[in-house]
């Protein structure tokens, strides 16, 4: 499960304290916080990306990828965005790019032997 970010102060913290990564058309800023269980996530898709249907398609894709991989994400606050190219990316590649970005910022949880 993923929760939304509703607190405005958190967005200021992304600029100050967030770790950032970019993989292809996807970018991610993360503040790892053990108290943020389940992970909190917001999506930022600017108007320059395209029309509202394109932006919504990207947002839905990001949300689906985040839900599918929520168990691999460290507790924390996530701000995720993407370029227009992300809307045309196959789902498997979109998942891979999401996980690569999370790995770059140190937000992936490695499964323990007991969990396998």
Q: What kind of region is each of these model predictions?
A:
Residues 1-116:
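Positively charged, solvent-exposed patches that mediate nucleic-acid binding
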């Amino acid at each position: 499960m993923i929760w939304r970010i509703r607190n405005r102060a958190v967005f200021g913290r992304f600029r100050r304290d967030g770790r950032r990564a970019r993989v292809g058309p996807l970018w991610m800023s993360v503040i790892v916080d053990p108290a943020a269980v389940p992970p909190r996530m917001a999506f930022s898709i600017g108007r320059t990306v395209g029309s509202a249907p394109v932006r919504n398609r990207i947002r839905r894709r990001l949300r689906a990828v985040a839900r599918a991989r929520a168990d691999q994400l460290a507790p924390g606050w996530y701000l995720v965005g993407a370029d227009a190219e992300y809307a045309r990316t196959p789902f498997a590649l979109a998942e891979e790019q999401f996980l690569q970005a999370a790995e770059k910022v140190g937000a992936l949880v490695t499964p323990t032997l007991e969990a396998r």
